[in-house]
C-alpha cells in the first residue's frame, strides 16, 4: 500500500514539473517570437515620418501579423500568466496597432517601448525563481 502511494505521488510530481516546464517554454517561445517582430518594426520617429507609403504598408502588415499571433496564443497565455502581465501586453499590442495606423508615431513609439517591457517581464516571470516558487 505504501509503495502505491509513493508511486502515485512521484507520478503527480513529475506531471506537475512537466506542466510547469511546458508553460515556461510556451510563454518564452511566444514572447521571443513577438519580441523579434517588434524589434523589426521602426524605432525612431525621424525614420518613420520619412518612410514611403509602400514601406508604411509593409509595417502595417507586420503589425497585423503580430496582432494575429498574439490573438492566436492569448487564450492559452491568459490561463498560465498573471492577469496584470497579460493585460499589459494585450493593451500595448492594441495601442501599438492603433497609433501606427492612425499615423500618431510618437504614441506608437511609446507603446512599442511599453510592449517590449511587458513582454520581457512576462517572459522573466515564467523563469524559475525564489519569488515564483514561494
Residue ranges of predicted features:
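N-terminal positive-inside, membrane-proximal cytosolic segments immediately preceding the first
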Residues: 1-7
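Hydrophobic membrane-insertion alpha-helices, especially the h-region
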Residues: 8-22
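Alpha-helical transmembrane signal-anchor/signal-peptide segments
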Residues: 27-44
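Short N-proximal segments of mature Sec-exported proteins
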Residues: 45, 61-72
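Short helix-adjacent coil turns
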Residues: 45-58, 96, 100-107
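Short, charged, amphipathic alpha-helical segments
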Residues: 56-64, 83-91, 109-114
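Short, solvent-exposed, charged loop/turn and helix-capping segments
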Residues: 67-88
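Non-cytosolic head/periplasmic domains of membrane-anchored proteins
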Residues: 95-134
Amino acid at each position: 500500500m505504501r509503495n502505491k502511494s509513493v508511486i502515485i505521488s512521484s507520478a503527480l510530481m513529475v506531471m506537475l514539473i512537466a506542466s510547469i516546464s511546458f508553460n515556461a517554454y510556451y510563454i518564452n517561445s511566444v514572447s521571443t517570437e513577438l519580441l523579434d517582430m517588434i524589434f523589426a518594426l521602426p524605432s525612431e520617429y525621424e525614420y518613420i515620418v520619412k518612410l514611403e507609403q509602400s514601406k508604411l504598408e509593409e509595417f502595417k502588415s507586420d503589425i497585423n501579423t503580430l496582432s494575429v499571433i498574439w490573438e492566436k496564443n492569448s487564450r492559452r497565455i491568459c490561463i498560465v500568466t498573471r492577469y496584470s502581465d497579460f493585460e499589459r501586453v494585450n493593451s500595448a499590442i492594441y495601442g501599438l496597432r492603433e497609433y501606427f495606423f492612425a499615423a500618431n508615431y510618437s504614441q506608437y513609439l511609446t507603446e512599442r517601448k511599453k510592449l517590449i517591457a511587458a513582454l520581457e517581464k512576462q517572459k522573466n516571470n515564467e523563469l524559475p525563481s525564489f519569488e515564483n516558487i514561494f
